[in-house]
C-alpha cells in the first residue's frame, strides 16, 4: 500500500503548499483571490480548493521514483541540541551523520519512513555522494 512521503499541492498562481505533520493546516490566498489549503502531513491528505480554479496535486508517495522522494521528503529537526525552533530539512540536503543518527535513535518512526532514510544512504553509496557535517 502506498504511503504519503510529501503532502503538497500547487495553487493556480504556482505557490506550493506543504503540510509536514498531522494537523499542520497550511493555507494560502492565491493571486486569483481564492483560498487554498492542505492538511494532514504524512498521515492523510485534506485539501481545500475550488472547482472553477483547481489546484495541482503534487503529493509524493512511496511508490514514486526514489529520485523524486529524496527531493520531496522533509524531516523536522530541532537542531543538534534539540533547543532550536523546528526546521524542515529536505532529505537530499541532510548530512550522512544526521541520517545515521536518526536511524540509530528514532525507533518510533514508521517502517516506510525508516525505509526512506535507508534508501537515501544506499542511493548515496551507489552514486558516490557524501554530505559531511560542517562542524
Describe every region a protein language model picked out.
Residues 70-135:
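Basic helix-extension-helix modules of the SAP/HeH family
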Amino acid at each position: 500500500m502506498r504511503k504519503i512521503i510529501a503532502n503538497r499541492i500547487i495553487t493556480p498562481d504556482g505557490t506550493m503548499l506543504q503540510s509536514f505533520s498531522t494537523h499542520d493546516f497550511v493555507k494560502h490566498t492565491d493571486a486569483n483571490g481564492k483560498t487554498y489549503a492542505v492538511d494532514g502531513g504524512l498521515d492523510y491528505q485534506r485539501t481545500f480548493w475550488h472547482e472553477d480554479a483547481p489546484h495541482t496535486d503534487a503529493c509524493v508517495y512511496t511508490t514514486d521514483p526514489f529520485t523524486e522522494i529524496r527531493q520531496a521528503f522533509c524531516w523536522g529537526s530541532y537542531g543538534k541540541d534539540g533547543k532550536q525552533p523546528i526546521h524542515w530539512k529536505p532529505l537530499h540536503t541532510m548530512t550522512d551523520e544526521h541520517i545515521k543518527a536518526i536511524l540509530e535513535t528514532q525507533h518510533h518512526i514508521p517502517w516506510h519512513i525508516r525505509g526512506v532514510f535507508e534508501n537515501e544512504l544506499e542511493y548515496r553509496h551507489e552514486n558516490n555522494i557524501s554530505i559531511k557535517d560542517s562542524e
